Amino acid sequence: NAGEVASGIAVKTVMSLVKEAVEHQDMNTVDAETGMSRHSIVLRDAIARANKIIYQTAKTQPQCEGMGTTIVACLFFDNRVAIAHVGDSRMYRLRANRFEQMTMDHSLLQELVDRGFYSQAEAQRATNKNYVTRALGVEPTVDVEVHEQPAQKGDYYALCSDGLSDMVEDEDIHLTISTFGANLETVAKQLIQLSNDNGGRDNVSIILAQVVDSFAAKKGVVDKILGWFG
């Protein structure tokens, strides 16, 4: 269907552009105006490009009219992670038994939570979860939300579609990662099974990652010399 076409374009475009940038650009720079790392900028721009391609495809191919998709993506670098998303696909982090949602949904429901009409607990049980306020391919341009967080050894990260987050409580996602974290493939299978057991109204997409060691960027000669002087 058209949604699968849109998500396929998004995955292919973002992966290709990020891979090309990492291999051929100087990634050790920071934008002087925004303070954004090159990694965040590359991720943002790749998603913006995917949006444009999806939008143009929908306009030129009648069978794809009105198609769109949500996205969440991340890029690990220098003991940090750049996180970008559009829509209600989410990223979670488990750190030292503290489980947190690292993205805020671009949805009508989240706006109602922000304005105090719903608590987070009430929002989890709400029926109007799927009205997104941002998506790829709907407009010629899109506002990609990007931020960075420190990444630590032992962290677990879960990126997922609403097919998981709508059907499985955050507490159960937390418990599943904590219980089966030694084998991420098992975690993924358990979470998909939980979603299906709870009604499985939508396809489930999930990516899991664990930080197994420090991945600080290698310093150049000048950086090392400056480091000697504190």
What are the residue ranges of the model-derived segments?
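PP2C/PPM-type serine/threonine phosphatase catalytic domain
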Residues: 1-230
